[in-house]
């Protein structure tokens, strides 16, 4: 034979996404496309979308993990914007990162000024005597 054709050639390997290669859940291909279309730079390296997707995935996991605590405290199984607000505002670093962000339906942190709290008096002791 002259060696033409595909008689004994290897089968092509199954396609593997860049997200699965990097061990991520966030879409590396989509992040790469958005970086190219966003006119952030003339060229985008191969490692940049992987790194950015990993950072976004980490931040999302961190916020959702912290938001699960207020949800559990309120005996809820679904995280709502209020739980996200409480999680972010009670965490020092996340609050600094998202300080200027307004979360719709998030509400405010419960806070009562010390001046407005009722004063502790000795009336209890006077009544006991």
From Swiss-Prot:
Covalent crosslink: Glycyl lysine isopeptide (Lys-Gly) (interchain with G-Cter in ubiquitin): 14, 16, 120
One Gene Ontology term of the molecular function aspect: structural constituent of chromatin
Modification N6-acetyllysine occurs at: 6, 10
Any Gene Ontology CC annotation: nucleosome
Disordered: region residues: 1-22
Positions where N6-lactoyllysine occurs in the chain: 10
Modified residues (N5-methylglutamine): 105
Residue positions where N6-succinyllysine is found in the record: 10, 96
Residues where Phosphoserine is found: 2
Skewed-composition ranges (Basic residues): 7-19
Main location: nucleus
Keywords, sorted A to Z: Acetylation, Chromosome, DNA-binding, Hydroxylation, Isopeptide bond, Methylation, Nucleosome core, Nucleus, Phosphoprotein, Ubl conjugation
Family (UniProt): Belongs to the histone H2A family.
Protein name: Histone H2A-III
């Amino acid at each position: 034979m002259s060696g033409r054709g595909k008689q004994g050639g290897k089968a092509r390997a199954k396609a593997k996404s860049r997200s699965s290669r990097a061990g991520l859940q966030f879409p590396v291909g989509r992040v790469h496309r958005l970086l190219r279309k966003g006119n952030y730079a003339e060229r985008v390296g191969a490692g940049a979308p992987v790194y950015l997707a990993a950072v976004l995935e980490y931040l999302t996991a961190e916020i959702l993990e912290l938001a699960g605590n207020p949800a559990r405290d309120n005996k809820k199984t679904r995280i709502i914007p209020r739980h996200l607000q409480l999680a972010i505002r009670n965490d020092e670093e996340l609050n600094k990162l998202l300080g200027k962000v307004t979360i719709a339906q998030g509400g405010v942190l419960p806070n009562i000024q010390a001046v407005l709290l009722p004063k502790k008096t000795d009336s209890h002791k006077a009544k006991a005597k």
